[in-house]
Amino acid sequence: MLELNGIDKSYGTRKVLDGVTFTVGDGRMTGFVGGNGAGKTTTMRIILGVLSSDAGTVTLQGSPITAADRRRFGYMPEERGLYPKMKVLEQIIYFARLHGWKADAAKKNATELLERLGLGERLNDTVESLSLGNQQRAQIAAALVHRPEVLVLDEPFSGLDPIAVETVQSVLTDYAAGGAPVLFSSHQLDIVERLCDDLVIIAGGQIRASGSRDELREAHGSTRYELLLNGDAGWLREQPGISVIDFDGGYAVFEADSAEARQQVLRAAVAHGDVVSFGRERTTLAEIFKEVVR
């Protein structure tokens, strides 16, 4: 488990991180979301030791992170960091060799990884000849080629088309399934919602919310409930303690002034006919994000 506790960082009089605390669990995909300037990149750079914090600790499996630990990390910065005139395969092999891989093993793993990321036909092309989306895939390969035990990725889905997004999702999911803590930032909240197990929301250098998707929906989700019947739901308007927000035939959205009133709706729905679905109105990550950063 990767854990940050009480991380502070200031530049002069400007405090950019204020008590940042969260965990990235083993085998879990953790989405790190926030607006521009919220503190995501600074936090990631502190995790990697690129920047030092003014206060707080970063630990891995309960112990302070060492230089040896960080060599087992896979880090992808938001900025392009590849050599533009170098061939794609040669470059990824080079990154594997920097991590101590022997030449043959580095070439084999780099080739397999690039093929899986959809760059199998571009191995001998220079980086500068690739589209921005393919450059992003190559940059992801550079972060993964040494088979890291922890992943920290800053905007890995930026510039990717939907097919490439699915490809990268599959690769990252496999890393998490193998037990690696995976932390990634993204402005694409739909991707974060679909992919991650846990969410961390940061604004103004402070963590505004963190937890699993279900935990965040429970804490910050809608207070409305949805009912869908194979029949008319007009009777719902007469239920005590119920305010109907929306209604269309057998579909209704309502709020209840108590848990008992809500349960009474379910009992009445069963008595009136075939219940297709009943539950809390689904709240999107975008809606939760807007609420907690307000």
PLM regions: where:
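ABC transporter nucleotide-binding domains
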Residues: K9-A203, A209
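ABC transporter nucleotide-binding domain
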Residues: Q169-A256
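A generic structural signal for secondary-structure junctions
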Residues: Q61, Q91, G100, E218-G221, ...
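C-terminal coupling/interaction segments
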Residues: D257-R294
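Conserved catalytic Walker-motif region of ABC-type ATPase nucleotide-binding domains
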Residues: L4
